[in-house]
Design a protein with these regions (language model features):
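Compositionally biased low-complexity segments at domain edges in trafficked proteins
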Residues: 307-328
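Boundary at the C-terminal end of the N-terminal hydrophobic targeting segment
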Residues: 31-35
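Long, amphipathic alpha-helical coupling/dimerization segments that relay conformational signals between
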Residues: 153-188
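N-terminal secretory signal peptides and thylakoid transit peptides that target proteins
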Residues: 2-19, 26
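Aromatic-anchored, charged helix-turn/loop surface patch used as a conserved interaction hotspot
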Residues: 44-49, 57, 61, 68-148, ...
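Charged phosphate-binding loop/patch that engages nucleotide di/tri-phosphates or the phosphate backbone
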Residues: 192-213
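Residue-level signal for inorganic ion chemistry
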Residues: 66-73, 160, 315
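Beta-strand-dominated extracellular/periplasmic modules and repeats
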Residues: 212-308, 314
């Protein structure tokens, strides 16, 4: 059964996979990524008090290894909001000639490049690739990525740029292949926009203050036990990121006393396909329900497509040992 579900500020396509799940639906890899800033964030007040040298030291790598961007943005101080700080950096990059922008993207290391030297990539970039999983691909996928990187450089003489933390592995590959058909002007414009997303997230995790940009989304669930007409407290929920015929666990949680669960919060919701797995049989077994052997429903799966990394997606489920449904 295919359903469409809208949320407060997001959109997802949901497919309910009904019936009993025997074993794992897909080959699995478990990677519970914990993105976030490495150092304690600065305050906007501290940023506005910096001299030029301190400002460039703090933001010289926001646009990867390009302190000139920070030097230009420094002239816009004081920044009334964190959003204004990021916009000043983006405006500094956007104001230079197209040739200089291309040179910036040309110097970037290729996505997933295992041979890149430490001085040619920032810690932030390494973290972003780690969270998306492109630094730990299978050998087959790594070879596929190497070929795409070469084809992209051969055509555009630039490194392929995408906001890793806003996209799943599957979406990164899809976008890579799709964007190879673009012309240079289109591709440069897309690369600049993706760099905007990358740097906005970096600034938001580096500085706290007034007017924070929205860079995180949230995926939540609410499960009701229709047998007793109460919230389902203690149901295990796993979230898998789908790529081809494999699944990668990216979150795990348990519903609270109100039947609610924060599945993916405090980070962008990467564009891509997902599968929620609700351990329904285990939950009702603990409630003392008489279940068949095997139970009618074991693990219930709900498939989603997320396409708003900063959106709010809520998945409400009503269930019994013999039925389940989405509700609004």
């Amino acid at each position: 059964m295919a359903l469409s579900a809208s949320s407060r500020r997001g959109f997802c396509r949901v497919t309910l996979a009904a019936g009993m799940l025997v074993g794992a639906l897909l080959p699995l890899r478990t990677v519970l990524a914990q993105p976030g800033p490495v150092k304690a964030p600065l305050t906007l007040v501290e940023v506005n008090r910096m001299n030029e040298a301190a400002f460039v030291a703090a933001f010289g790598d926001t646009y990867e290894l390009s302190p000139w961007v920070a030097k230009v943005a420094y002239a816009k101080r004081p920044f009334p909001t964190v959003t204004a700080l990021h916009q000043a950096l983006a405006d500094a990059f956007g104001a230079v000639r197209r040739e200089q922008q291309q040179a910036f993207f040309r110097r970037l290391s290729d996505i997933g490049d295992r041979t890149v030297k430490a001085e040619n990539i920032t810690a932030a970039s390494k973290l972003e690739q780690s969270v998306s999983g492109v630094d730990s691909l299978t050998e087959a996928d790594h070879e596929r990525l190497k070929k795409l990187n070469k084809a992209y450089r051969d055509k555009f003489d630039m490194s392929f740029t995408i906001a890793n933390r806003r996209n799943t592995q599957d979406t990164i590959f899809t976008q890579f292949e799709r964007r190879l058909s673009n012309d240079l002007a289109t591709e440069l414009a897309i690369a600049i926009q993706e760099e905007f997303f990358i740097t906005r997230l970096r600034v938001a995790e580096q500085v706290l203050g007034e007017g924070m940009p929205r860079v995180y989304g949230d995926l939540t669930a609410h499960v009701l036990n229709t047998v007793v007409g109460q919230p389902a407290n203690g149901m295990a929920i796993d979230l898998f990121e789908l790529s081809g015929d494999t699944g990668r666990k990216v979150a795990q949680t348990t519903t609270n006393i109100d039947g609610r669960a924060d599945i993916m919060v405090g980070r962008p919701l990467p564009n891509g396909r997902y599968e929620l797995r609700l351990a329904m049989a285990d939950y009702f077994r603990k409630q003392g329900a008489a279940l068949g052997s095997p139970p009618f429903f074991d693990v219930v799966t709900i498939r989603l497509y997320l396409d708003n990394p900063e959106g709010s997606i809520h998945v409400p489920v009503a269930c019994s040992p013999w039925s389940y449904a989405m509700y609004r």
